[in-house]
Each structure stands twice: as structure tokens, then as C-alpha cells.
């Protein structure tokens, strides 16, 4: 319960501050757990600052009070509209990358090293084996489609440190009437704990098929992977989960992996399972996530070349948004005590004393690491300003030169499109819908984008 509670509170107050979500009432026991977790998180955050020799961080952007001195910026003229970005096709020795071989053998490893060291952290080389167990199978219906639902647990080998146990939770759903292995869209999901209220539904919203039903209508399957069964979404949990298991319950080093990288690692372990399941076409596995899980989806796609496609929804700072943009959520927010656990400790340096101009990489290079595989970047409008749709578009557009080097197509434009314009003719797609902080309105466009790859 503690993990779920912290995720929900952080999401409501940090990730999408302009949304009218209801904060569920907590019991006194839950209040006590929350306070203890926050205290432990602050202590871990302070310990990392001490390790880095940082006395203080710059103030975070305030997305809740537009009159605050540190109010989040939503003025394009003040957003660094023409950022100077690190060159994606120039080696560190200054030589230009002109061939696919040079990109794959030389430049790509340079970029990965920078992201490992400074942004997302390094995955240990000796990560343990995961043994997947099917703990239940259910034949049922989703709408009018008969489905087979497998409930799975991925048991992480903890023989090196039995004090910490990690079981990765996932469900896999495939059409019962499929005559051959099917593509699968994998989502970083979230389950509301019993007793917690979901956000109120919009009574004026039209009732559309769920994304799962839309996927099934194409003959595909879907999987829901619970990231918090891999690693907690708070700083207090960094000595637990897969990160804690690898560190034997000790604190992180400055370049150790954060939660985003850990969740992405878990997605790769799910893909390991898909490669063994006769119902699944393991060459056609997509990864999708929204908000913080959109960040994780992009990281998973960038690091694991087995993922065929990704839908990155409202990922914002730390995801597809350019770090070198002052719009909505910024580096200082992600380096703060509510979000720092997503990243390597080293990332905190760029919120004090360093700045975004000191970063060796930016998010256009993260998108470029996915090439030549297709990436779809989505965002909303009102209620989703925090994630900087334009900054994410700019990153996708700037990655295009790598796609073109590898014989594919980028977005095809550097001009930010009008609202609800679908850019899906290239291998980097983009759409900003008119809704808020939700992936739902972009699912039909993503599916249209994905069809040409899942044929």
C-alpha cells in the first residue's frame, strides 16, 4: 500500500499539477507510513547531495501557483525557443558520422555512455536471472473479443542477497481465436489499490473503445507490466527493489541506475518471457507508457533493440522533452526530492552548480538511440502544458538525421504542427491531442502508425 500511495500522491501533486484529481483520504496508518517514507526519501536525497558535494539545488518550477516567484514558465519567448543542442552525428573527437557503421560502432556507444553516467545510471553487469511463472490462466471476453489472460510473476534470483525479494508482476492478454503468434503492446501500468478513488469521469466525454479493445480489434495482444513490482517510485525505496537487491541494501553510487532504468530493465525481462511464449510474436513487441512511465518506455526502447516500436505519452522532462527548454517541468524538478530517484545521482549536478548547457547529451539523442525503429511521441493540450509538447516535438524532429542515415524517415518537418495534426508518414511520429494529461485520444493514431510495422 505504501508504494501505491506515494505514487498517487506524487502523480497528483508533481507530475500533472494542473489536473483536477481527487486526493484519496488516508487512514492514520497510511499517514504514518507516508511520513516515514518521506523522511527516508529526504535523507537519501541529502546523502546523494553530500556524495556529489552539492550544498543546494536551484528552486523547482511551481506548476500549481502561476503567481509564485518560481512559477513554471509557459511563455514560448522565454522557453529557450532555439536551443543549441549537442550534435548527434559528431564524434567526441570532432569527426562527422557519415555511415551507418560509424553510428552503430562509434557514435551510438558514446551517447549511451553519457546517458549511463550522467542521466539514467548504469545497469549492473551481473543482474540476476528472472524465472517466469504462469500463476493463472483465464478465458474470458473483452467486449466482443474472446481472450486468454495469463497472470505471470517473474521471480528475480535473490540468492546473492536473500533479504530482498523481487517478483515482477505482469498480465498477458491474447485473442483466443488467433491462428498464429500475435504482436503485443506492453504497457507500464498502474493498479489503484482497494479503497482508493479513481479520478472522476468526465460526464460529457464520449464512450470510446478502450486502448486494449482497439488493440484486440487489430488482432494484437497486450500486456500490463507493473513497474512498482520492479522498483518503488520513491527515494526511500532505492535500498529495496532490484536496485536495492543489486546494492545489497546499501545506498547508491552517483552513477548507479535510477527507477526509470530499473523499470526499463524489467520491461526487457518481460520481453525475455515473450520470446518463450508460443502465443506471442516476439519480433513485434511494442512498449508504451504515460507520464513518468512514458519516460520509462522511451528509455526501454532506446536501450533494448528487441522492442519493435514505442508509444511515448506525455513523458516530459527526463523523457522526450529537451532538457534545454524552460517550459513546465524542468531539470530542477526532476533533481528534487520527489523525482530524483528516477535518475542517476549524477543528474542532480545539473540543478546546481551545473546547468543544462553542461549536459553532454539531450533527449533528441535518446530518441536517436531508438533508430531505425519507429517512435511515436504523444501529448495533450490543456491540462498537459507541464510536459512541453513542443519540446518533445523538437527532440523527435532533431533525431531525424539519424533515421535518415539508417535509411528511414524522420518527422519530415521542423515546424510544430497545429493541434490534433497527425505526423505519422515517417518513422518518428507525433501528435498533440486537444485533451489533457492522458494517452487515450492518441491511441487510434498510434495504432494507425503501428499497423505498417505490425503487418
Residue ranges and their predicted role:
Residues 122-184:
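N-terminal cap/lid segment of alpha/beta-hydrolase-fold proteins
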Residues 1-25:
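Bacterial Sec-dependent N-terminal signal peptides
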Residues 371-389, 433-435:
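Conserved strand-to-loop "acid loop" that flanks and positions the catalytic carboxylate
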Residues 309-366, 388, 392-413:
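Mobile cap/lid helix-loop segments that gate and shape the active-site cleft of serine hydrolases
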Residues 180-281, 316-325:
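Cap/lid segment of the alpha/beta-hydrolase catalytic domain
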Amino acid at each position: 500500500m505504501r508504494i501505491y500511495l506515494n505514487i498517487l500522491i506524487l502523480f497528483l501533486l508533481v507530475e500533472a499539477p494542473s489536473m483536477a484529481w481527487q486526493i484519496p483520504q488516508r487512514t492514520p496508518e497510511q499517514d504514518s507510513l507516508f511520513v516515514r517514507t518521506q523522511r527516508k526519501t529526504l535523507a537519501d536525497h541529502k546523502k546523494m547531495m553530500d556524495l556529489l558535494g552539492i550544498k543546494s539545488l536551484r528552486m523547482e518550477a511551481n506548476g500549481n501557483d502561476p503567481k509564485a516567484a518560481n512559477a513554471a514558465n509557459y511563455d514560448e519567448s522565454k522557453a529557450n525557443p532555439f536551443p543549441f543542442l549537442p550534435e548527434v552525428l559528431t564524434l567526441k573527437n570532432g569527426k562527422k558520422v557519415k555511415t551507418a557503421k560509424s553510428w552503430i560502432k562509434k557514435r551510438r556507444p558514446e551517447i549511451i555512455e553519457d546517458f549511463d553516467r550522467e542521466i539514467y545510471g548504469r545497469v549492473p553487469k551481473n543482474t540476476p536471472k528472472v524465472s517466469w511463472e504462469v500463476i493463472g490462466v483465464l478465458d474470458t471476453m473483452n467486449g466482443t473479443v474472446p481472450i486468454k489472460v495469463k497472470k505471470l510473476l517473474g521471480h528475480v534470483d535473490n540468492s546473492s542477497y536473500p533479504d530482498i525479494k523481487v517478483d515482477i508482476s505482469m498480465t498477458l492478454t491474447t485473442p483466443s481465436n488467433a491462428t498464429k503468434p500475435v504482436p503485443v503492446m506492453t504497457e507500464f501500468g498502474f493498479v489503484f489499490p482497494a479503497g482508493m478513488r479513481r479520478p472522476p469521469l468526465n460526464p460529457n466525454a464520449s464512450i470510446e473503445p478502450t486502448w486494449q479493445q482497439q488493440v484486440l480489434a487489430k488482432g494484437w495482444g497486450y500486456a500490463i507490466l507493473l513497474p512498482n513490482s520492479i522498483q518503488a517510485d520513491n527515494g526511500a525505496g532505492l535500498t529495496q527493489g532490484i536496485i536495492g537487491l543489486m546494492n545489497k541494501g546499501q545506498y547508491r553510487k552517483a552513477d548507479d541506475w535510477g527507477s526509470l532504468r530499473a523499470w526499463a530493465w524489467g520491461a526487457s525481462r518481460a520481453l525475455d518471457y515473450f520470446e518463450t511464449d508460443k502465443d506471442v510474436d516476439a519480433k513485434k513487441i511494442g512498449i508504451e507508457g504515460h507520464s513518468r512511465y512514458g519516460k520509462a518506455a522511451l528509455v526501454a526502447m532506446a536501450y533494448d533493440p528487441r522492442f519493435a516500436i514505442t508509444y511515448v505519452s506525455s513523458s516530459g522532462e527526463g523523457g522526450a522533452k529537451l532538457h534545454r527548454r524552460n517550459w513546465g517541468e524542468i531539470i530542477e524538478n526532476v533533481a528534487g526530492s520527489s523525482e530524483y530517484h528516477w535518475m542517476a545521482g549524477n543528474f542532480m549536478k545539473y540543478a546546481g552548480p551545473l546547468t543544462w548547457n553542461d549536459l553532454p547529451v539531450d533527449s533528441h539523442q535518446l530518441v536517436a538511440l531508438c533508430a531505425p525503429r519507429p517512435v511515436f511521441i504523444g501529448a495533450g493540450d490543456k491540462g498537459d502544458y507541464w510536459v512541453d509538447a513542443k519540446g518533445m516535438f523538437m527532440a523527435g524532429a532533431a533525431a531525424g538525421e539519424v533515421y535518415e542515415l539508417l535509411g528511414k524517415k524522420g518527422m519530415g518537418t521542423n515546424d510544430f504542427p497545429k493541434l490534433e495534426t497527425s505526423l505519422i508518414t515517417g518513422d518518428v511520429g507525433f501528435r498533440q491531442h486537444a485533451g489533457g494529461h492522458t494517452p487515450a485520444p492518441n491511441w487510434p493514431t498510434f495504432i494507425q502508425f503501428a499497423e505498417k510495422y505490425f503487418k
